[in-house]
């Protein structure tokens, strides 16, 4: 079926079930950023393939909301479908909730699959729409009803993460979380975020593409831990190890019945932003719910010394692969046929040669020329273009290693570029260097520091429409909270930067139909000196790959900025050159020369 035919079929099911508007988020049953093939209902209905977006279907309209990363991509993919693009955050553009409040009136019904909407959002919708006399119907998977040949739920093998990689045993982690439960006065802890469960139990899987997680739910009490997952994914030795640490396995879907047995005198701690609305609604009404952040959130984000040291190793290995890739690109562009897709395959080949490499940490963004102006462009056979010996190639890629997860962006100068392009290339690089060199008092958040990355562009009256940085998991999700860099204050989203947090530093600049630039390093937060004013903090760059000096205008940089770049490049040469052949090493020596 075409997108138009799918929407027609969905509207027919809506009529049958008395639903006037149907909400289709991107989420799976666990609030994951990226989802398995089974859960891609929004993509199936709309044809939009971006990782973030929400669709609303009514009888007389269809709309898709997405953020600035995807404006260009969404406009292209929605063309001819009859779906209206709502550019989130733009002036005069209503939010999904504002649109629903305005367009749903007395007696109408909003429907959605309650397993794909958080309890918090469902409550907000219910309260808002109740004022209009609008009801909710949350037990229908209407998109799934019309999905022909829908993929099955993933069930990839589960493995244990050895303590030499994790740095802390499963038993010790569970003991820590139980102490936190006790402090909160909680009898039960309901955990449904897949990366949190994987972190807590020191297990990894493959149920989401490029995310080594296991489809599962978890309930912890003072005496037991129930894991709800598909038994077929677990080898006997993994099950026995889990049981030894007090973890018992139950069928994946059985949690929805289990939570109905919670007693009224018990206090249940869960995060309504993370747990889906159907699960929470199944908990007896007289059970007291403590709506708190997941107790695993901060322990997971603050990497222990073993994890940090392992990450340094992972980034050297990744740095070798990416450095070899950049050298190969510059040597061969214009001499042999290279396209965006074949370049991505070549980079995967270089990474695969590295010890302990597992997989990409996300689908690679290899964007040449005007494609680089699309912030999260993914090449397909239909969009793939050849690389030419001119302009910029933006390569935003990453890998999973047993030692951790990487995420790096380099903008490679493929040949002649304009002075204007070099001006922006240099401005973005200055932002990356200045944020990475920050020294700040403990207690600062990413909001306090974000201006360091944006200032060079703001001075030019320019900006970029995405966050400056995100947290990164340890052999887990490449996007991990709560740490981030952004200039807008988001309620509940401004975490203090703590020792051990790994965050990306990735300002950019994008000229629609022209070019795109982004420079990204990962960095770990560390303690610096302590004075009478308090504990100072700093960052250490983990990423070890040269920035392309062919795009840099030294005269546009301060002496301090040039010194920062030279010092960084000296580190890159020292750590990466031993793993290169003679020809590559000579190239790297020039690529990291002092300016």
Residue ranges with predicted function:
Residues 1-595:
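Active-site neighborhoods and metal-handling regions in enzymes and metal-associated proteins
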């Amino acid at each position: 079926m075409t997108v138009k035919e799918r929407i027609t079929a969905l509207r027919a099911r809506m009529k049958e079930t008395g639903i006037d508007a149907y909400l289709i988020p991107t989420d799976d049953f666990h609030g994951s950023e990226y989802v398995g093939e089974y859960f891609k209902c929004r993509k199936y209905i709309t044809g939009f393939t971006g990782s973030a977006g929400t669709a609303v279907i009514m009888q007389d309209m269809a709309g898709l909301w997405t953020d600035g990363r995807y404006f260009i991509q969404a406009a292209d993919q929605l063309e001819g479908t009859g779906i209206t693009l709502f550019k989130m955050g733009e002036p005069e553009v209503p939010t999904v909730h504002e649109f629903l409040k305005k367009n749903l009136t007395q007696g109408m019904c909003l429907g959605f699959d309650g397993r794909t909407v958080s309890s918090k959002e469902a409550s907000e919708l219910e309260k808002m729409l109740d004022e209009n006399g609008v009801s909710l119907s949350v037990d229908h998977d209407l998109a799934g009803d019309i999905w022909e040949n829908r993929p099955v739920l993933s069930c990839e093998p589960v493995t244990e993460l050895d303590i030499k990689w994790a740095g802390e045993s499963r038993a010790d982690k569970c003991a820590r979380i139980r102490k936190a439960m006790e402090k909160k006065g909680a009898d039960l802890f309901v955990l449904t975020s897949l990366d949190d469960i994987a972190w807590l139990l020191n297990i990894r899987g493959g149920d989401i593409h490029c995310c080594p997680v296991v489809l599962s739910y978890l309930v912890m009490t003072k005496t037991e831990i129930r894991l709800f997952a598909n038994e077929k994914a677990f080898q006997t030795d993994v099950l026995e190890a889990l049981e030894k640490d007090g973890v018992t396995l139950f069928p994946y879907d059985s949690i929805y019945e289990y939570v109905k047995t919670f007693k009224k005198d018990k206090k249940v701690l869960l995060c309504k932003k993370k747990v889906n609305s159907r699960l929470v609604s199944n908990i007896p009404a007289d059970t007291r719910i403590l709506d708190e952040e997941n107790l695993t959130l901060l322990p997971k984000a603050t990497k222990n010394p073993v994890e940090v040291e392992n990450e340094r190793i992972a980034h050297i290995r990744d740095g070798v692969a990416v450095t070899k890739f950049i050298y190969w690109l510059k040597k061969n562009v214009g001499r042999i046929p290279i396209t965006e897709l074949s370049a991505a395959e070549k980079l995967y080949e270089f990474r695969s040669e590295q010890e302990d490499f597992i997989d990409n940490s996300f689908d690679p963004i290899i964007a040449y020329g005007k494609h680089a102006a699309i912030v999260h462009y993914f090449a397909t056979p239909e969009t793939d273009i050849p690389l030419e010996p001119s302009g910029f190639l933006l390569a935003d890629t990453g890998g999973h290693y047993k030692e951790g997860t990487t995420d790096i962006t380099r903008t490679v100068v493929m040949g002649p570029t304009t002075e204007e392009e070099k001006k922006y290339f240099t401005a973005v690089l200055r932002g990356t260097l200045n944020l990475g060199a920050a020294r700040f008092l403990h207690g600062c958040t990413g909001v306090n520091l974000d201006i360091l990355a944006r200032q060079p562009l703001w001075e030019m009256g320019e900006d970029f429409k995405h966050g400056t940085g995100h947290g990164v998991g340890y052999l887990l999700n490449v996007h991990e909270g709560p740490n981030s860099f952004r200039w807008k204050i988001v309620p509940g989203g401004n975490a203090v930067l703590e020792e051990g947090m790994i965050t990306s530093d990735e300002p950019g600049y994008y000229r629609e139909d022209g070019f795109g630039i982004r420079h990204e390093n990962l960095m770990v937060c560390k303690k610096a000196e302590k004075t009478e004013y308090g504990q100072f903090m700093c960052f250490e760059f983990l990423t070890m790959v040269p920035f392309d000096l062919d795009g840099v205008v030294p005269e546009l940089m301060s002496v301090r900025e040039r010194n920062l770049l030279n010092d960084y490049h000296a580190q890159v040469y020292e750590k990466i050159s031993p793993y290169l052949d003679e020809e590559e090493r000579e190239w790297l020596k020039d690529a990291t020369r002092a300016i």
